[in-house]
Curated annotation (Swiss-Prot):
The keyword Transferase is annotated on this UniProt entry: no
Listed result of changing residue 404 to S: In strain: M1-106
GO cellular component, one term: cytoplasm
Native source species: Cryptococcus neoformans var. neoformans serotype D (strain B-3501A)
Residues with the N6,N6-dimethyllysine modification: 3, 316
Protein name: Elongation factor 1-alpha
Result after altering residue 371 to S: In strain: M1-106
Taxon lineage: Eukaryota, Fungi, Dikarya, Basidiomycota, Agaricomycotina
UniProt-recorded Gene Ontology molecular function terms: GTP binding; GTPase activity; translation elongation factor activity
InterPro entries: EFTu-like_2 (IPR004161), G_TR_CS (IPR031157), GTP-eEF1A_C (IPR054696), P-loop_NTPase (IPR027417), T_Tr_GTP-bd_dom (IPR000795), TRAFAC_GTPase_members (IPR050100), Transl_B-barrel_sf (IPR009000), Transl_elong_EF1A/Init_IF2_C (IPR009001)
Region called G4, residue ranges: 153-156
Highest taxon listed in the record's lineage: Eukaryota
Consequence of substituting residue 222 to R: In strain: B-3501
Amino acid sequence: MGKDKLHVNVVVIGHVDSGKSTTTGHLIYKCGGIDKRTIEKFEKEAQELGKSSFKYAWVLDKLKAERERGITIDIALWKFETPRYQVTVIDAPGHRDFIKNMITGTSQADCAILIIATGIGEFEAGISKDGQTREHALLAFTLGVRQLIVACNKMDTCKWSEDRFNEIVKETNGFIKKVGYNPKAVPFVPISGWHGDNMLEETTNMPWYKGWTKETKSGVSKGKTLLEAIDAIEPPTRPTDKPLRLPLQDVYKIGGIGTVPVGRVETGVIKAGMVVKFAPTNVTTEVKSVEMHHEQIPEGLPGDNVGFNVKNVSIKDIRRGNVCGDSKNDPPMEAASFNAQVIVLNHPGQIGAGYTPVLDCHTAHIACKFAELIEKIDRRTGKVMEAAPKFVKSGDAAIVKLVAQKPLCVETYADYPPLGRFAVRDMRQTVAVGVIKSVDKTEKGGKVTKAAEKAAKKK
């Protein structure tokens, strides 16, 4: 794997039977991090089970099964390379918590690949009012995934028909436009994830296909295959210039070292000697050292999963869901309340003021009350449709005032995207998603450790 290649994260979305696993499996199998030994092992098992038509989806099923059982998988298995990028598939849906993962997800996707089955009836099912295709695309857009690639899969099942492809492009264009994407900036690639047509190499089965084009602010790019479309993703900018925000995933107590919080740097930089503040617990202390993969590093940057050692802080003072920031540069604070744009995905009844589901925002998992429904809006244009509605139901978008039932630290989506989007969970499913528009922060005194005071004097 090329160490120096730029990393991009993609999420693969689409209807249940669109062929997501086969297509993703194919890319990982052909350009990825699965070593020959593992592949041979899988092939042997497949033959023993009479699955000798060993196809790529099986690679993914194996990986998924291991992941479901909680075996941590060598993450390289979910990676593949293009000429420019090292690509990580963040999550292939079909996973129970796909929607939740996409929102609180360990990483933000830079691009979504929407897989559409072109078979007669299949396409129509996926794109119908309640189809997952629509929900996934809406979700990706709401959560700030601004780049999209559409792969029209299973072209072999419709005899590689140009008319069918054009019909699907036309329909899909209409629907992604409604969601908010600009169809001109979206490459459409006709593929067969099973046979491999237009995946890595140009197909000979569709002589009519002249290639895809996409127009963005940075110009026009063209290509033939899905791999080329992925290679044409606009390089993401990582927010190192923003103040530090690091939501804690865990806090460990390590003998001889002390308290070690662990989490992913979302914005900014963390380094030894910094005086950091944890919100909403309001503890301020000095960072003694930062490490990644059990090695000390000079600094942790956005996207890095780091552990850092803090002085004079007990494991009781800080916990998962707390947010670490620089005490001298826009430190994080507790949110007394916050206003958010919420889109209701699937709730069986009506949601009114007083509704108190659980919110998953970054690593926090806390009950929040819908204190007030401020206005109902058109989710595409943002125009107000009704002031102070009594209720909202599935499909509606509204601006809502939320109050956490326990201390919580969140930020606006505009300032700190990963801390400004959330999933609303109830009845063991994601009933809504939200993007935070404004936060009412509370100032209150907290614990300042001796180490922090000393560090402050040194300066």
